[in-house]
């Protein structure tokens, strides 16, 4: 049986080693940030302190209530992928401070992070109370981290979305697109059960755990007037961690109903609100489908239209990565006259891109693409890319600064938004040919511009303020507000014949609006049942947009004479009754009454009285050396970590031993590892060994260093070779054994959104005090590996195309390894080919090997070879199994059948009758059948399990089987075999 288990504490990508760090403190938080960002750090510290009592009020616990130490908050100022993370083991908060720019909520980014991540810090307090609190003294911070396995990401993230919605005037619960997939599904009879909505699907349109968690928890709070439901849930879990169905039991206590009756009522609570709102918005405009009907999950994004009516869309499905497609138009400006069959692929673009915009003067598409630094995972930039439609040429216009939302300014310039690492932003005018900045417009600190457009002589910006989204304009001298900020979202701001067009969820669904900047009149252009995801107007006045469908999204078209075209008042925006009820509950808990209408005026947040920011210290240098060794978890036993990562039935009993361990990692994730003591008895000699172990990784410099040492695992050994007897003698001395290794490598990797490629050079040395023919064994190694491959689609196992190679000298061997991927016969299928070759550079009586040359059907075969080669072929064929589950215990997402063939040519050391190793060929042919689980024995983590059948053969098989019958399977010659497969990633 082959098991593979990967488990580790949370290690984050690293910031650039050149950064100098500072810190600032309050009674509950210590913010660690790069030098030169003092003002930015103070903003985040004040926001975290401001919301700390409020975000924990309905949970019954706030950050610092049970864990009485300042919580480290690490600010990443060079990461353009806006996000936040709270993790325990070690406890810390990590915030990417560059504001969200792809689909931001209608609140400033620091407030969003303080609310959402602040709720997570409150949730983590549950790991320090009741049963978990007692276990904390035994295992340290590993317990709060493990306690999160009970609610899982569904409840943790859903509860955080409830908090950000209830404690603000916006949040994702007040975003029209957030739950839209559910409304389409419910309208069309798609009533998936709890497990299918909760676990999602690779093959069916399913929102993520943020959306479903909010749907369920907000429904519970409003349907049963239970604002403290999550407080009851966490309290129950901390007192009864042995209960595998805590949610069902707490829900029954809250609702008085069994789960099978309460769950439909929760969904109806939301659906009734949706249907009432849809009835209010009728009548809806007609639309015809332009995109090709498909049964596979497909998404259309980023629309643009040329002067001739050619529609340009970014399309992706579960079998293909995102690419730019064109749907041909006509000379009179009609869009999509070619019909679905006229869809034509232009180029791959990747998924990590910004909004595409069309530059008519040069027939260009311009957009931003995120490029990650080859070494530092927390450092990346957004480059401006262009695509010339007539020639099909793609190029990078600006590589230096990072920009978002590039648009046409005039015939010679484009305008783009630049977010500063120190906070603040600007709008830069860039020469379209040289890529140089020719003018820079400063943006007030109170605004975060998200989209811009140019109508001479003004630059218009849709921006976020404390009160929500609004539209401002500037001619370079001053900024003027032309559409007041309100808590709704705005997207795709464009210049349409001198007017502004944009999408907004102003009326409860994403619709398109037109704003006459001279008359100050706002017109709602579209009105559809499910709204649109992206809109663009065709030259003849038709409206093209994408909207939710059964299999993702689809491209629709509404003719110009059928558009909604009604004037509306911007201030009369849609209210969300469930979200307003959540806010009223929070106000009630805070001991004050707040009218829901007041919540939507300005930037009012539901907090409570007496929540003024705490006193903070001044900035001071953060000493990385002084904070390097941070012990966060421990164990009253010793665990063989290498054995855990490659677990087999034979080694299960050897995984844990008497002893103790301590795990350490600094808050910056540059130094991590463990130290341990083990007491073990030699079963043959009866002697007890008291050994010490250390494993350390340091990644704070360009090269990564890994140190591993084991002392007194056994006695030191000496080996001598007797030529007369052709025998190797081993002698155990009384001295302790010392084994140590040091490895250094530079993990360089690039990703342009379409291809991933990298180079990893490495060197290493291994020391042992064992004596081989009167010589201490000091083995050196050096190598380099490289790869280039496409991204792997969601429903595939392998990349569509890719190749990699490695060459390594590991004294006394030289080996080369090559692998590649090619597409299979059907979508999602693929073929992986590998070849490995090993050669001995110097003879030795002490056999070991650098590469495994045995076919996989031979299992843990003890023989090893000096020289040889191995070739393998795996054909992976994944298939949909209907997302089946067994109660709440198991949830299977798909199956995979993988026929394989391994062929080895090996050079032995003589005949097997004289104790040597036979030469010749060995092969294994067989098939793996694996199931992918997202829930396995109630634990929500990726798990694969399956079965392997194999047949062994080759010219050397008879001699190998005679020498080691355990290498075979069943049957008279042991050629057939079956083994079980299992792998998990915690």
Task: List the predicted regions and their residue ranges.
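Juxtacatalytic substrate-recognition/specificity segment
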Residues: 7-146, 152, 160
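Acidic/His/Gly-enriched intrinsically disordered linker/tail segments
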Residues: 11-16, 86, 90, 105-113, ...
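Beta/coil-rich, acidic/histidine-enriched accessory regions frequently appended to metallopeptidases
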Residues: 12-15, 20-23, 204-207, 231-357, ...
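A flexible loop/linker signature enriched in serine peptidases of the S9 family
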Residues: 173, 177, 315-324, 348-354, ...
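Multi-bladed beta-propeller domains
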Residues: 276-299, 327-356, 386-403, 420, ...
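Outer-membrane beta-barrel initiation region
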Residues: 283, 296-298, 302, 566-700, ...
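Outer-membrane beta-barrel translocator/channel fold
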Residues: 510, 531-533, 550-553, 685, ...
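C-terminal outer-membrane beta-barrel translocator/porin domains of Gram-negative envelope proteins
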Residues: 730, 771-918, 957-974, 980-986
